[in-house]
């Protein structure tokens, strides 16, 4: 998937992932499941949306250290399953114009089938009530959580690629699903530093540049097609 999306960015707050230093290092086992080796790593929490039984879209923040990753895993039934970074970008493309991209595509082994949702290829309008579904890193049970929110006007990003929400998102919600009427219409990626009660998300229209050709849904249950994603980066 060699697609590019160019977005205009302002200064954002710390991305919606959390880090923790743990004495484990994940490596890929023959089964695709994760084994552990003794090593200090930094664990980065985020959320991803499965749009195909083998593919997940998340943010470049979650996979931003892809060149240095010890491993990146998807939590399936409370078990870590090793994934491969198919595409990842969290970088400024043009400093003068502040053009920026923050998207990642992950792939799991073909022997593993994810619950995938359809991501609607449409713009999102100001005033729409929506639901956020993701994984808070403080939730030790690895269960998805949902919050109601509303799309609000904001001049930070140009529509229709980017929209704003009337709430600040918790850690672990980078890559959370935005839905309305039970359909995924976007994905969160960051909080604003200009407004403490504003966060941002990509519309389904923006995500379609990465997901449309491979979007093959298997479920309509958004809680089932969102997964916690964990990146492991060597601490030293």
Regions found by a protein language model. Name each.
Residues 34-59, 175, 197-198:
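A conserved glycine-rich beta-strand in the N-terminal activation segment of trypsin-fold
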Residues 71-72, 82-89, 114-115, 185-236:
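C-terminal cap/linker of serine protease catalytic domains
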Residues 43-45, 51-98, 190:
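Catalytic-histidine neighborhood of serine endopeptidases
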Residues 48, 54, 58, 106, ...:
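Terminal peptide-recognition signature
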Residues 95, 114-174, 188-198:
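Flexible, gly/ser-rich surface segments that form the specificity/activation loops bordering the active-site cleft
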Residues 16-18:
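Boundary at the C-terminal end of the N-terminal hydrophobic targeting segment
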Residues 4-13:
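Sec-dependent N-terminal signal peptides
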Residues 44-46, 52, 70, 99-104, ...:
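Envelope-exposed proteins and targeting segments
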